[in-house]
């Protein structure tokens, strides 16, 4: 072999060796995700456990090898439920150091960002379940296209439809006659208002008499006046559109006023912490659960949830409310979509979006019996139309630690019914 050939062979070997050595390093390039949370604003009561669920999940993912060997850099930012702060943060996440995807929070900010997400091709798995975020193409005609928006669980609108379907049957089962009366309650804000029209439409369809909506703020306060209005209206079923924090104030005020009504909470409207705070006033509230079980439930996937929880509670003794587990499920759906993207062209926003369409009746690995199966398609981002209804049961004083109250049955979640809604085209995006 000539000297020239030897040198060429050596050079090729060095090049191949260099590429071989570089490959693992390239595979380890961190994957950036944004995580918008409310730890300090008016929805922090439910935002804190949900956000902790997301943070713990990615800490656990990184501890167990990351995504295809790559670490996830989760940038968690508390925006205090302020839309301008959310938009300012989004500009950073869509800038030079662009994130592959975002785990979002509120309705007002998520809807404000929908067009930007589509333009910048950044998927957003939000904690807003506004139906307007579920129509990727705009074909439903009720909302603007939201091709990069996803959420885990039934939409606010579908949850109301499920609860009112149950309420109509409940009215008959109790032997009541005449039209039951329904009222929408909540702040005059995009989040509580999101399912208002859809709820009132199906209520009318089901034979309810619609009452004038009752407005109360997103923050705790004295809502005695609202409860007196509710009492005098003769309402039989009342939808609580706010988060648990302000709902507690309403429940307590209405109990004091002697209001006899069946409260229907939205998905953020009730949890174990709220039941402890409200005590007997929370007894009987019906609300939807996004997961198949609550904390400590009998399911194979609960072992995974318990391990994830230890990332911020090494002792494993903290009771996690329903919102924490929903945060875990949302984070793991995102993780698997990112994982698919990394294996199919790279973890870009476009590929992550495609990752959400790869499975039908999808439950994240290791979460069997915990996360309800979800299916997203390019034409329909309603991941599920199943609405699992539970009743909050409170017996006796609630001064003891939450763990003890749950163990002793002082607070418990009682399954009421599962409503499987039809996938109606005219409900898409509404």
Can you name each region flagged by the protein language model?
Residues 1-27:
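Gram-negative bacterial Sec-dependent N-terminal signal peptides
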Residues 23-35, 63-71, 168-181:
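Immediate post-signal peptide segment of exported/extracytoplasmic ligand-binding proteins
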Residues 30, 45-52, 64-139, 152, ...:
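Beta-alpha junction/loop-to-helix N-cap segments that form part of ligand/metal-binding clefts
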Residues 30-55, 77-84, 106-107, 185-194, ...:
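Extracytoplasmic "Venus flytrap"
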Residues 43-67, 197-205:
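Short, polar/charged alpha-helical segment
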Residues 99-211, 262-287, 293:
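Extracytoplasmic ligand/sensor domains, especially the bilobed periplasmic-binding protein
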Residues 142, 300-320:
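The feature captures the short pre-catalytic strand/loop hairpin that immediately precedes
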Residues 311-324, 335-404:
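Segments of small-molecule ligand-sensing domains
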């Amino acid at each position: 072999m000539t000297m020239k050939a030897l040198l060429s062979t050596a050079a090729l070997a060095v090049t191949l060796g260099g590429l071989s050595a570089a490959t693992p390093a390239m595979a380890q390039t961190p994957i950036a995700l944004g995580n918008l949370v409310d730890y300090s604003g008016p929805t922090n009561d439910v935002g804190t456990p949900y956000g902790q669920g997301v943070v713990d999940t990615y800490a656990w993912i990184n501890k167990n090898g990351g995504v295809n060997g790559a670490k996830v850099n989760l940038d968690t930012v508390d925006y205090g439920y302020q839309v301008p702060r959310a938009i300012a943060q989004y500009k950073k996440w869509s800038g030079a150091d662009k994130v592959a995807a975002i785990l979002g929070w509120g309705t007002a900010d998520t809807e404000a960002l929908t067009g930007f997400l589509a333009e910048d091709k950044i998927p957003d798995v939000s904690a807003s379940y506004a139906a307007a975020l579920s129509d990727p193409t705009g074909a439903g005609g009720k909302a603007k296209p939201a091709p990069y928006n996803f959420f885990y669980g039934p939409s606010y609108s579908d949850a109301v439809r499920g609860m009112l379907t149950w309420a109509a049957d409940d009215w008959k089962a109790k032997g009541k006659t005449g039209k039951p009366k329904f009222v929408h309650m909540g702040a005059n804000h995009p989040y509580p208002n999101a399912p208002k029209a859809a709820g009132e439409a199906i209520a009318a369809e089901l034979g309810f008499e619609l009452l004038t909506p009752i407005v109360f703020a997103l923050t705790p306060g004295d809502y005695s006046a609202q409860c007196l209005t509710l009492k005098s209206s003769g309402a039989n079923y009342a939808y609580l559109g706010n988060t648990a924090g302000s709902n507690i104030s309403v429940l307590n005020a209405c109990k004091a006023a002697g209001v006899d009504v069946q409260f229907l909470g939205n998905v953020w409207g009730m949890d174990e912490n709220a039941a402890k705070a409200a005590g007997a006033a929370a007894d009987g509230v019906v609300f939807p659960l996004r997961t198949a079980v609550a904390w400590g439930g009998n399911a194979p996937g609960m072992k995974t949830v318990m391990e994830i929880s230890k990332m911020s509670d090494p002792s494993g003794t903290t009771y996690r409310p329903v919102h924490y587990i929903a945060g875990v499920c949302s984070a793991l759906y995102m993780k698997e979509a990112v994982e698919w993207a990394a294996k199919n062209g790279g973890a870009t926003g476009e590929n992550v979006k495609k990752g959400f369409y790869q499975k039908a009746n999808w439950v994240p690995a290791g979460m069997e019996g915990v996360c309800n199966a979800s299916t997203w398609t390019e034409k329909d981002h309603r991941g599920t139309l199943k609405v699992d209804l539970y009743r909050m049961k409170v017996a006796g004083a609630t001064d003891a630690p939450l763990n003890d109250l749950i163990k002793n049955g002082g607070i418990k979640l009682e399954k009421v019914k599962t409503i499987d809604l039809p996938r109606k085209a005219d409900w898409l995006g509404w």
